[in-house]
Amino acid sequence: MSLMTKLGLRALVASCLIAAGGAAHAQLNVLVTGVGSTQFPIATANFANEANSPQQISTIVRQDLQRSGKFTNIDAGSAPVSEGDSVDLGAWKAKGANAFVAGSVTKLPNGQYQVRFKLYDTVNQQSLGGLELVSPEGGLRMSAHKVADYIYAKLMGGRGVFATRLSYVIKTGNRYQLQISDSDGQDAHIALSSPEPIISPAWSPDGTKVAYVSFEKKKPIVYIHDLPTGRRVVVSDQKGNNSAPAWSPDGRTLAVALSRTGNTQIFAVNADGSGLRRLTQGSSIDTEPSYSPDGQSIYFTSDRGGQPQIYKMPASGEASGGAQRVTFTGNYNTSPRVSPDGKQLAYISRTGGGFKLYIQDLQSGVATALTDTTHDESPSFAANGQYILYATQVNGRGVLAAVSTDGRTRQVLSVQGGSVREPSWGPFMQ
């Protein structure tokens, strides 16, 4: 069986798994297992006036911090504490909290909501600042995620990804749904509903668009979907298969896998569908392109060596500098995704008859399995490079999962009564 056939079947099998789940609830349910090597103890008090708010901001913040695997929540009691209240930092330190968060939620005369908070360092007895966020009612959850991102950045020294979004595909009844949700699987909405499969969603670098493959015209066609307006543009409707869209870092170009010349090869196309040009040449199957974060290279899957492996070529095409093999652990490796810093490669490796998520240091070449499941697929890095989202199976049902790049923390995102596949983790919000 050819590589393209296998990959195509894998996509179709994923679609069948979605279908097998039946009707699906609109929200993802999150289960966190494992913790980081060290956890930062923090107490987040109930925010003042949030009892009258449509969303409990402090609860969402605590849940976000717990999901990261890097924090442990110290009980802050039930009494609300405003960012303007006098705080006994020594008392919170004595309770085991190295940081303390206080805040408030206020409904403004125009109907919007103001969220204010302050973060304290109880060890050094000082304020670490805070934010004032204003949003409509529907944006309160995102405001809470931004609070958690601020805390993460101040205490961990890197950007958090709580205020990012996910895309994934659910089969509900007889229709496929491309859904967009917050990073915790909540506040989900349907971007596209179709009676035919939808696969391979890929976020644009600015987070306003998603490219994907839809079978709505009884063949795979690549679309770009503008999320704010719902407007769609056909990017590639060539003869044969149109698949595996991947954005360039500047958002101007997509790499796609097309079979218009026979065997599947990698092409580049402008984001408006113009300027199609071929990037790989030869008789092998070349597919699943993924740009490096600097836009200079494309990683892709090819069977040119007899078995599917991951290769790297210049973004202008292999005619400009050839293609170099990247993976050497195992004899079947697919689905390359490069970390945002360009230092690591996530991919799927067939091991012992199953498919596992691996991560490889691109400098040393050392590869490590991150999971113990056997049906992993579709890896996608978080924008900060600390986590990888992927699809897998638990008890025979398709779920999404996220694992930290050190393998210590795992999240499972499932849909009640159904299966979910085809995940993609969105970029930092602009």
Curated annotation (Swiss-Prot):
Its main location: periplasm. Keywords: Cell cycle, Cell division, Periplasm, Signal. GO terms for biological process: cell division; protein import. Residues 1-26 form the signal peptide. SUPFAM superfamilies: TolB, N-terminal domain, Tricorn protease N-terminal domain. GO terms for cellular component: periplasmic space. InterPro entries: 6-blade_b-propeller_TolB-like, PD40, Tol-Pal_TolB, TolB_N. Pfam families: PD40 (PF07676), TolB_N (PF04052). It is found in: Periplasm. It comes from the Bacteria. NCBIfam families: propeller_TolB. Part of the Tol-Pal system, which plays a role in outer membrane invagination during cell division and is important for maintaining outer membrane integrity. The Tol-Pal system is composed of five core proteins: the inner membrane proteins TolA, TolQ and TolR, the periplasmic protein TolB and the outer membrane protein Pal. They form a network linking the inner and outer membranes and the peptidoglycan layer. Belongs to the TolB family. This is Tol-Pal system protein TolB. The gene is tolB.
